């Protein structure tokens, strides 16, 4: 196995390992250590089946229940319906546009996602990349006075706030939306495995509690945009079969647009946050 860091402050490419085969404990420990260090790991040319994708995912923890609460283990992020590319004005396409803004998966839940594993199945001829931003290095780059001011601050994260402009309230049933009430997360978090501090912001963060609404929204947007600058970002051009895992606890990500008439099919699994009372754990994993 070879682990080659990118030139950014995050990300490494892992080669010489076949994720279609069961991993030894030693090999997985090396992968997990690299993941904690680099936060984003790229595994080229894996071509995993759904079962293999899920088996690797479960090495990192329990599976997260999707917002549809339909028991699905995998989320299909696609602009295909009934065998054809959907028009850009369709609800399905509009919903995907929201993913082009920086975010941490599931931060609008009480317990945000631990990890996401995204596999490329069909990719467009141009565009459609995914980009990650290192919020550990973003925190490190802040002025001391800003670090001090942010300490202890709580932000409200809201599914409605981030998804309503992109049809997110229409795509879910009323019963599903009942489970997606606004939640609070610390603006500065400490990673449980590394002890490093990082910003926890992105599109789902609506405002900072106890501060002026518009001023705090502007600050959150500035922290996100200024944090997501080189050398703290890595952008991956997908090839079919690629798999990437990232740490939602300390990394933001966004997708890039691609030609509206070209297909893009990605499959994602999500590892639930390590909270024993996490209500978003898949039922079959809840007792694990």
What are the residue ranges of the model-derived segments?
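Non-heme Fe(II) oxygenase catalytic core, chiefly the N-lobe of the double-stranded beta-helix
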Residues: 1-243, 249-288
